[in-house]
């Protein structure tokens, strides 16, 4: 058990009975030493150091509830976030993860305009009703229409007049044999016998109209004939195809976006809020710092109705500081990621399981969720992170190998890989993430002191297959602990294990001839 007094004492036994409160209290939290001649220590543990203790269970894995709070205002259907990294999360992955019930955090290594466009892409990917559909006026050229269709991957555009009234619909079929790119869209669009829906039409009513008329796009107009929305057959199909998707009040997928302490911070936050970002992630390698705390206060003062995730921290004091500054969720993790070298380069950090417990000890009574960022290698690690007090886990390398990630696909020795790099790597810092590590964005790349590396991860296929295995592992773990939901899982006990115990936990004394989709020793 972790000692209850005297931070330097050895751990006397192998059974650790520390659900949530085991690291609470002044003698067990990571506070700065007040006496410069005395150094206090606690034992720092990570996922491989412990196992969850099985308990009496009256629930089957398929019946557990895995919904969780991302912030006080946002509920996710699965406790999974994708990392705000430029080889992990852009619109395609954010869309795929939101459809499965999680949330993608778009990286910030791009211009404000491009990041806002990425948010817009997620929001437009599906919707109960598109309230701001892409439109063209009657005097636009066919070439403009084709470009818009290509850029937004859409097959039709409503055409409006100067007053906003619906004048017609332009689809791929109308343009199939057109060669004059300067011809006006009004000359080729469908304008007679337009089928529309009145304001207030719900999805069921829209589906009946679409089915009866055999069309794919249904403009919604008000009593004055002005276009106020668009309902598509594809959006209706998405509702049934992805029943676990997380959506906002308008039926659009949820998405987050990262920002840093930079000169364009407030402009970036404003742009992201304007296009509908559901949560902003104020991202730093060291969240317990003056710059982050002041930036957080400034954002909360100027944008009162916005959810902010702030981080990263690894101590009780750090978590409390961000909570007091207005964070709606706190992200935990200094150095646990597979591509992060902070602990080696800077000598600073806290093993991830202990860091999660530290943060949760500070925040649980405040009702502010903890996000465990980094260090997840197996599905069981996610279960342990949640049991230690996290509400969600954020993963980078796990998602970096998926089809939807933005990293380049490469072939090496006959196998497919995807590029993956830390945001503290030279490559990432040179294109925008240096402020995350408090380094001058204008400096020559040779002057950077990297805290991450660039590498590759095995190609893993579609994201939904990865999510399926992680959700399955979580359900299994909750079943073993007798937990009906994540709150009950956080009351589970841990047992501290030795290296021999971990070797015993892995497959051993056998040569694996057929790999499982959720297990590898590499």
Explain the meaning of each model-derived region.
Residues 5, 21-22:
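Glycine-biased, low-complexity coil/linker segments
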Residues 30-56, 136-137, 198, 205-208, ...:
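Alpha/beta catalytic cores of nucleotide-metabolism and tRNA/nucleoside-modifying enzymes
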Residues 60, 64-76, 83-85, 114-154, ...:
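Bateman/CBS regulatory modules and CBS-like beta-alpha motifs in cytosolic regions of diverse proteins
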Residues 75-80, 129-132, 249-257, 300-314, ...:
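Short beta-strand/loop segments at the ligand-binding rim of alpha/beta enzyme cores
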Residues 102-114, 280, 284-289, 332-346, ...:
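Glycine-rich phosphate-binding active-site loops on the catalytic face of alpha/beta enzymes
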Residues 106-111, 154, 158, 165-181, ...:
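Short beta->alpha transition motifs characteristic of CBS
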Residues 112-119, 228, 232-245, 264-266, ...:
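Active-site-adjacent beta->alpha loops and helix N-cap segments on the catalytic face
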